[in-house]
Amino acid sequence: MSTPSLAREVAEDTVRHWYSAECNTQAAARRMRFSRQTVQSRLERAKQLFPEMFIEANNSPSHEWTLPQFHEIEIDNGTVLIGSDAHIWPHNETIMMKAFARLSKELKPRVIVLNGDILDGARVSRHGSLLGQNAPKLTAEINAAHQWIDTLYKPAERVWTMGNHDQRVDNYLANNAPELDDYAGRLSDRFPQWKFCWATMINNLEVRHRFRSGIHAGWNSALHSGISTVTGHTHQLQVTAVRNRNGTHWGIECGMLGDPSHKAFEYAEGSTSRAQSGFVVVTFRNGIMMPPETVELIDGRPVFRGNWIV
């Protein structure tokens, strides 16, 4: 039986999307807006007609991005624990960081996402320092992050979406000592058990450090994405429903694991803000996302489902 024809241009485009999606057929199909069966069929035909495409793509030094654009995860049943913006300094494990660790061991989530800005990168910032602030060295921040991360439950899927403060580490090296990049390594090399990426797609939920900003960041992120989103960066903790003829999806901002009053944020001069310590729990049932839940400080203690955690 002869192999069905497939245009070279179509094959090249399919193979490119497949490698860009880390050889995940479902993820490639989502990006191409085709069915999984269509993409799988095209890949099978491409392997028969143009096997050299796979060799060339596999041997290429880079697939366009320094980090994966998306890390795709499929869940039928289970929970996802998402926290961001710890802005870790040494000897400063906040009550919300402790609550995140404790709840991770109670819920035993399928996925833990550290949604960016886990490090602060105070001494490798492009912004000037405050006189007498005595910001910690980067190595001290990394060591403190390791100590806290070691207290977390360890699911198979551990994802770290890159935040702008996390980027300070690699950006400093790239701009000040690029000839040492292979020697010094990336931030991801310091945390090899974690999957570093710009965003992760969990079923039809997009988790990334930042997208829209402002007081309505959650709403606008979900509205313009067209799907449920979880973002950090703003330090706001809130859940906003976007409802239309297609149903409901959610714009979720996951607060911060750090302390808004810590000296790392002295640049804000102590003014009132919407920053709120907290994090997010998302549950899936039969592949469907349930309404998201938050953990936040009530009277100085973290609360989840009406109960104190710490």
PLM features: residue spans?
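Short, amphipathic alpha-helical "recognition" segments used to contact nucleic acids or chromatin
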Residues: 5-23
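Short acidic low-complexity segments
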Residues: 188-202
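Mobile, glycine- and charge-enriched loop segments
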Residues: 61-93
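Major-groove recognition helix of helix-turn-helix-like DNA-binding domains
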Residues: 34-52
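Short alpha-helical "recognition helix" segments of helix-turn-helix
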Residues: 27-32
